Structures are given as C-alpha cells and as structure tokens.
C-alpha cells in the first residue's frame, strides 16, 4: 500500500503515519498545505518546519500554499495530490467531521482512499500511546483556561498527561487539543532517522493565549 501523509508537524498527523508504518504501508510523500490565514482545515503553527521532518523521514515533501477560503483550500489539496502514484492518503483527524469529510471528498474525486486511524480514539489513551512509542512532543501554542505561558515548550510526558486530565475535569480542556486548546510539534519519533533540536524559538503571549514560534532547528543523530 502506497500512501501520502498529510503532515503539519503536529502529533496527530505523525502518529497516524507511524500507525501506517506499523501496518507495513509505504509512505511515499509528505504533503503540507500552508494557509495564508487561519484555516478550519490546516494547522499553521510552525508549518515551515515540516521540511526537516520530511528530510528526517527520508521522503519528498510536496508543499502548496492556500488562501484558506473554504472551497479553495480543498482544491489546493486536490492539486497537491494529483498525479501521485499512491493508493491513499493518511491524516491525523480525531474528531473534526469538517476535516475528515472534506479529505474523503478529495480522495473520492481522485479515486484513492482516505485513512484516519485515530478517528474517535480516546485522547488520553492516544497521548500515552505516543509517549510510549517514543514520541517527543513539544507544546508550541496554548489557548485555554489552565494552560499558562509555562506550558509553551513543554514536552508531553506522563506527568503532563495527568495534568491535562485534571484540566479536562476542571475546565473541560480537550486532552487531545482538538478544540484548539493547544498545538504541538514533534521533535522525535520512530519515523525520524535524526531527531530535531530547536536552536532558536520565540515566545509570544497575549490575553491568555500564546505561541512558541520556532525560528531554527538542526538535525542530530540519535
């Protein structure tokens, strides 16, 4: 099975790709859509650093910009996938019907399959599976009650997951970040030949939300 992986650099898209690898599927391409503004379909945090991720995975990266208008961003994904010798596309959709159904629509038009192995999985269980599989996941954006500036740059581990679980009970924070509570960037995982080291990053904080903007990374042997 040959598939293209829709990658944002975040935990869900890369863990979905890891599951594909466990199935024995061949990931032939990474595909990244870069929105020019806030998008319902695509992530924007540190999207420029998918390139070293694809390099570490040893696969070519297909990038396409989009103005992030509802129908245009679908057409841009279709254009990015056209002509690929693949059987399907894998994505990290967990709960967004908007995202999942639109990817399925594009795949149907292209005559390929859409795979969403994380769909409706328990968020806490997924995080623990990721950590157990060797994923090093940094939190790079927060926007929720209980998630202060100190969370920016934090690596998700068992203690972090326990805290997210408590915040879920107290403030209804989605443990997976599916409501936009937080965004992530994967520094290392079994898909990488080399891990990523952040050499320069800048924090921004305003009115209860913030980002960790990555400015420079380097690859390091494991």
Predicted features, each with a name:
Residues 1-222:
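Nucleotide-activated chemistry modules centered on ATP-dependent adenylation/adenylyltransferase
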